[in-house]
Design a protein with these regions (language model features):
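N-terminal redox-cofactor-binding region of secreted/periplasmic oxidoreductases
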Residues: 1-190
Length: 190
């Protein structure tokens, strides 16, 4: 969806996007708290790992989206960027343009962060990011408190300067609905 959006910025381009699954019309896709109801349905590939020796040879279920927007239409909507060290390692291996400092401007350009304003986040981009205060519960607050009491530092912005620590989750939600890559990048250019 992101690539289709970017390619469509040039009016000389005609873009065809093929999706293996169907449209993202299933009601549970739009309702943030209903995401688990999408597992093992027609919008899920239903992948499993090979038998895993460390868990008594069980196969581990891997839900993956099979609908417009892919897994961004079926996952738990947590917005977590890759770790700085991973991007820098890719660049060190010869992948020019993939260092953290080189990809950060693209994260910023894509993002519309509702709460955080600093040099690591964007405003006005197509991908909405929020703390989704409706999901803030006493249990979530107790979890963060327990982590801090056990030596894990609180990190109010794990998509910022430092990723380590405990935090409430940043979500891809807008107006109390899932904000998938299809909603953010594809539907605006259809």
């Amino acid at each position: 969806c992101v690539l289709a959006n970017r390619l469509s910025e040039d009016p000389a381009n005609r873009v065809l996007l093929l999706e293996a699954g169907g449209p993202d019309k299933k009601m549970e896709i739009q309702i943030p708290a209903a995401y688990a109801k999408l597992n093992r349905t027609e919008v899920d590939w239903g992948f499993e790992t090979e038998p895993q020796p460390h868990v008594l040879n069980r196969k581990i279920y891997l839900p993956r989206g099979k609908t417009l927007g892919g897994s961004s239409s079926t996952n738990a909507m947590a917005y977590v960027r890759g770790n700085r060290a991973d991007y820098d390692e890719w660049a060190a291996l010869g992948n020019q343009g993939w260092s953290y400092e080189e990809v950060l401007p693209y994260f910023i350009k894509s993002e519309n962060n509702e709460q955080i304003t600093n040099s690591y986040h964007g405003k006005g981009g197509p991908l909405n990011v929020t703390y989704a205060t409706a999901f803030r519960t006493p249990v979530a607050d107790a979890f963060v408190k327990a982590c801090v009491e056990n030596g894990i530092p609180e990190n109010d912005d794990y998509n910022g300067a430092e990723q380590a620590g405990t935090s409430l989750v940043q979500f891809n939600i807008k107006g109390q609905k899932r904000w998938s890559t299809a909603a953010a990048f594809l539907k605006p250019v259809l």
